[in-house]
């Protein structure tokens, strides 16, 4: 049987043949490189100063030597405002010293991928101070960039909560930036120039950075508080006395060897040094689970439920104002900020960790307490503010009448001094407010009268 093809059919076949021949002769495009696996991290530790890593170091040793995890580190500052136990180097010179100390300490545990944000060391306890001096937006941009570069499964960082303890504002700022980056790094609209492909990656003067959005799976926090009961049941804990099967020594010993590189920050006296090391490394490493986007339990291992690979971006709630009515009294400053921050980042459980507290912020036994008088009515109000203090405490400005405009908030800065006789005790400070002859509310602050931190 002979099949006759029409002229049109023969033309189609001829065109197809010619196109196929031309297609076969086209050059292949160069492969599109995947993200650089040299910098892929399992854990990204985000802290403030060289030597901050020591609090998590026993756990990091376990993760590195037993679980073969790759760890990268971001420091917010070089620690240029700290003291120097071994030399006269200060300010920028001390920062240069501490950078080398920090890199050597981490290298002793096999951690080589280390970045510094160039924030100034800012001794204090108010997180808003550090965020201001670091340049909040620019620092966040850098952290998001490094999360996208390292693509960590888990982020470890300082607890973004105001606590009685060292309570360093730089520590808190590191925790804030890490949390914000956790929520933004997977969003291609956040710092979009970072995820734009370069026009010609082998040429100069490109403006697209060629990174990929990346959503970490978990974020855990650790704290510089001087008491630990509020951390119980909030996340996994790791004994520092456990012996590493691969190294034959305790994880505390591995951390101590690393920490010995930070000589500028350690006591020169051997007895004092041992006491200092024991103070920090005798306790277990306690984590608070911030957020998990994979299945697992609060107390489960850090990597419980984590499997390698990208996951979709999960948006946080973002800021939503809470409708309020009438007149109210609340703590201001960092306490006010954290109330909004926790809600915006789906961290409502952090508000339940502990009631408002602080420790004396200087050798003069003083404490600073910011207060806010809110007027959410349509008329101006006269508000009387009084304090209820333990015996012997002194306060400025003391009882006073405040005129608060309609739909306005009046910030009050209370400064108090505790008597020497109450050292090493917990005390309670209360403020009450009334308007139109009626009480409108009160706030209470627990204060540890035991100087153990930087000035407020």
Q: Model regions: which residues?
A:
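Bacterial N-terminal signal peptides
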Residues: 10-23
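Metal-dependent de-N-acetylase/amidase catalytic core
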Residues: 25-46, 129-130, 136-346
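Active-site rim/loop-helix segments in enzyme catalytic domains that contact anionic ligands
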Residues: 25-150, 172, 179-183
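Short beta-strand elements of extracellular/lumenal beta-sandwich folds
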Residues: 364-378
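Terminal connector regions
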Residues: 420-455
